[in-house]
């Protein structure tokens, strides 16, 4: 007779899926979570039952791919960072070679992404289990948000005199953009400037009149 410990271990071990089925389940759960975030605007109250119901699978199916809701939200957050990077890259590629125009484009793209996908934007920085800056920006190119920040850092460097350290300015731009997004959400009645005007004024304050 198997021991109680062995039985318990067997019951909690994730089952293997047929080849290809696991990937489809993984993708469908992330997609379902993304749809619910778009509809709800945040992850508050988002449940395993709601996600699996949207994905058309049983609640227990989630545990075949993820340890729980926190791990699923981390996966959705990672994918959202990739989407934000793609969104900013597309804005950059649509510009010419003018450094200020390129920085304007990716700064606006950052804000537009947050406006269009508020639920995804919120979990970028508030996902359960995240270890702050170490995991977001990472070390040795491992951070999930490093591509996004590197775009801003490189574009900032192009607007500064050669040899200048772009890090302090890039951090100030990032925190200001994040603050603009966050405050507009909680203070919608305040007379906020248009995104384009705000970004232009922000850059003028740092780099002077273009």
Whereabouts are the PLM-identified features?
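N-terminal intrinsically disordered/low-complexity leader segments
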Residues: 1-24
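Alpha-helical structural segments
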Residues: 24, 28-35, 54, 71-94, ...
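Amphipathic alpha-helical interaction segments
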Residues: 28, 50, 105, 109, ...
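Helix-turn-helix
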Residues: 28, 39-71, 75
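Amphipathic alpha-helical packing segments from all-alpha helical-bundle domains
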Residues: 89, 133-161, 167-171, 197-208
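Hydrophobic alpha-helical connector segments
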Residues: 89-119, 146, 163, 170-173
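Short secondary-structure transition hinges
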Residues: 112-154, 182, 189
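Amphipathic C-terminal alpha-helical segment
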Residues: 174-192, 206-210
């Amino acid at each position: 007779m198997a021991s109680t410990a062995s039985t318990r271990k067997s019951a909690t071990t994730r089952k293997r899926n047929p080849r290809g089925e696991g990937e489809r389940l993984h993708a469908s759960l992330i997609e379902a979570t993304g749809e619910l975030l778009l509809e709800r605007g945040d992850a508050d109250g988002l449940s395993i039952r709601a996600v699996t119901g949207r994905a058309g699978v049983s609640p227990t199916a989630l545990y075949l791919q993820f340890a729980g809701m926190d791990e699923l939200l981390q996966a959705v957050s990672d994918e959202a960072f990739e989407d934000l990077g793609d969104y900013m890259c597309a804005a950059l590629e649509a510009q010419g070679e003018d450094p200020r125009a390129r920085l304007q484009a990716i700064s606006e793209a950052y804000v537009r992404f947050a406006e269009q996908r508020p639920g995804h934007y919120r979990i970028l920085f508030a996902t359960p289990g995240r270890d702050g800056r170490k995991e977001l920006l990472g070390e040795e190119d491992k951070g999930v948000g490093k591509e996004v920040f590197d775009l801003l850092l490189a574009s900032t460097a192009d607007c500064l005199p050669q040899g200048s350290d772009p890090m302090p300015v890039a951090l100030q731009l990032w925190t200001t953009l994040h603050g603009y997004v966050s405050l507009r959400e909680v203070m919608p009645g305040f007379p906020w400037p248009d995104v384009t005007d705000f970004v232009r004024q922000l850059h003028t304050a740092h780099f002077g009149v273009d």
